[in-house]
Amino acid sequence: MQIHRLIKNLMVIPLIGAFSFTGFSQNLDPYLQELIQKGLKKNQSIQINEINAEQAEIDQKLAKSTFIPKVTLNGSYTRLNDDITFDQETQDLLMATQKLLIKEAAGIPFNTPLPPGAELREPANLQNKNILKSSVDVDWILFSGFEVTNAVKASKHKASSLNYLGMAEKDKLAIQIITAYDQLALVYASEKVLETSAEYLKEQSLFVKKAIENGLATPIERKKIELAQQKLVGKEIDFQNKKTLLIEQLVQLTGEEKNQLEMMVPKLDFNRLSNTDDQEKRNEIKALEEAELAVQYKAKMEKSHFIPKIAATGHYEFLEKDLSLLDPKWYVGVGIKWNVFDGFQSHLKSKKTQLEGLKYRTQIEEAEEMIALSIVNEKLNYKSKVQTVKTVEKEVELAQETYKLINQQHKNSLASINDVLDALTELEKAKFKYEEAIYNQRKAVTALLHAKGTLNY
């Protein structure tokens, strides 16, 4: 069964952020939600899974249609080499019988000749050589020994399993889009940090220029600032390259127009969870449970092979002219079929299917254990990332104050330009670190809600 292979693949996803999610849409940017929906419509794997689910639903309808009467219209023309007649002795007997009946009706002795004008009919043919037939047949299964009933239930649960599996596939794609979107937001936030650093360097360049004019600084200090500015340009190019790659990734994932993605400016905001205890059953677990039920009903279907089956049949001839003397114009009947012994095949097939159900039960237990461990791990990771944001906030404050102090000292000739550039570098690093901490905190939120099955999109 295809569901087995797909679920097995899901089971080997890394522990962190490994399972599906279903209560986070209020914190997602509306445009991000739109991108996710476009991605869900575009993704080929999701489309294939939807087709598989639709096929399973058709299987269910096919099983139900077993109880619908089947009506067949028949038409044929046959020409024999000759009419089919009675043998000569039988024909003579039939003619003699006619004569006796005529004499009896006329009230004359049997041994007297036939009265004048008495007509004898030639014996009818058993079958004329030209045969034109038109008929209708009706076949109707009245009782399938519960095979059809169990087949319908098996198909129903298989379709449900594929639907849940499709939801899990959608979750995986949504996570990819959310991650790419947040990474793009991190790039934009980092570019703002570079813009601030560029403003600081511009300010330092103007100060050093005036200091050189007044003989208070050397051209070397200006060269150092120019070098720092070139390093910023290099970083900006790196961020532009990352932005281009991320936009291309979003184009591939969502099918959105590139120019539309280039116009958006995603924001990277801190996202705090109000409640980390809510939890729902994962789509993977639901898919496994439905698959388990499907094979259970399949086993019942195979086991019911020994139960008698009952069917009705009917036949009606529209044309009577060419019917043989032995053909009925219509008939109806009821039949029973009972497979008393099939060499243990049904029993062995049912046993094999039951073992397949045990495999699903084992996978369910394994998945539940993995989910429980994943939730604990993601809760700890979330708390750690929240604390990291608080710590880095203090680092940014300290770096900001340090830069202001050293910059003031430099203006009072108490610190060198190297000290100012070092302080600016540390401030820049602290801000980068802060934006990355926010990104990791958002990622931890997604991973936790994902693990608990409470992330919507």
Residue ranges and their predicted role:
Residues 47, 70-85, 122-129, 139-168, ...:
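Small/polar (Gly/Ser/Thr/Ala-rich) solvent-exposed segments
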Residues 25-86, 216-218, 251-296, 300, ...:
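Bacterial Sec-pathway N-terminal export signals of envelope proteins
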Residues 85-87, 92-126:
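Flexible glycine-rich, low-complexity coil/linker segments exposed to the extracellular/periplasmic environment
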Residues 1-2, 30-34, 58-60, 164-281, ...:
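Periplasmic alpha-helical coiled-coil/stalk elements that build and connect Gram-negative outer-membrane
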Residues 135-137, 181, 311, 333-335, ...:
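Membrane-embedded beta-strand positions in outer-membrane beta-barrel channels/transporters
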Residues 88-95, 268, 328-333:
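Flexible, surface-exposed loop regions and adjacent strand-edge segments
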Residues 48-63, 169, 175-192, 210, ...:
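Amphipathic alpha-helical coiled-coil segments
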Residues 11-22:
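Bacterial N-terminal signal peptides
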